[in-house]
A protein has these predicted regions:
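Active-site-adjacent segment of FAD-dependent monooxygenases/related oxidoreductases
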Residues: 1-39, 43-52
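Flavin (primarily FAD) binding-site architecture
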Residues: 75-89, 107, 164
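Glycine-rich loop(s) and the adjacent beta-strand/alpha-helix scaffold that form part
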Residues: 100-110
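Short hydrophobic core segments
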Residues: 48, 68-79, 153
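Conserved FAD/dinucleotide-binding core of flavoprotein oxidoreductases
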Residues: 12-13, 17-20, 25-30, 64-67, ...
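Glycine-rich beta-alpha-beta "Rossmann" dinucleotide-binding loop(s) and their flanking helix/strand
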Residues: 85-100
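Conserved beta-strand-loop-beta-strand element in the redox core of flavoprotein oxidoreductases
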Residues: 50-68
Length: 176
């Protein structure tokens, strides 16, 4: 990807500057790391219940009770990470002030005009209390050829914390 651009409200480019950068997808990164890792050392679906760091590595206990020793523990266990809670118990999640909706569209399902707008561009559009970004990522199976990739889009919307419950549930909380 060679350019960064900002769009006018009508969709036409407002500014464009050369800014080469590489984009990928979590799926492609995951598959590359997974291929490099031996299957017998990967514990998918085995809940981590305890770990301790020592001079010679990390001892890990899994849900079934088995204990293994590793040189490195990668805590890729999500937003409410057990690993992070154990290492940094004082760090608590806090609302960032916005919500985000994300989606992907196969290039093959996007119109030519849309593809011309986004191909080779990391694109932003600013709106009232929100913005959208869009860029091309590899296809579902890691394809990088034109026509087989996907358009990744994320819509960020600034929402006061007091309105978050109603937004996320469709319900309003009335406090008397």
């Amino acid at each position: 990807m060679n350019y960064r651009q900002y769009l006018h409200p009508g969709g036409e480019p407002a500014t464009r500057q050369r800014m080469p950068q590489l984009m990928t997808s979590w799926g492609l990164l995951y598959r590359a790391l997974r291929r490099a890792f031996p299957p017998e050392r990967y514990y998918e679906g085995s809940p981590l219940t305890e770990f301790s760091c020592g001079e010679f590595g990390v001892s890990v206990r899994f849900g079934a009770g088995d204990v293994q020793r590793f040189d490195l523990l990668v805590g890729a266990d999500g937003a409410r990470s057990f690993v992070r809670q154990q290492l940094l118990p004082e760090v608590k999640p806090r609302y960032a002030g916005y919500v985000a909706w994300r989606g992907v569209v196969p290039e093959s399902e996007a119109g030519r005009a849309l593809l011309r707008t986004f191909d080779d561009h990391f694109t932003f559009q600013q709106m009232h209390h929100s913005h959208i970004l869009c860029y091309v990522i590899p296809g579902a199976a890691g394809e990088r050829e034109r026509g087989k990739r996907r358009l990744n889009w994320v819509w960020y919307w600034n929402v006061p914390e007091s309105e978050l419950f109603a937004l996320m549930t469709g319900m309003r909380r009335e406090i008397a």
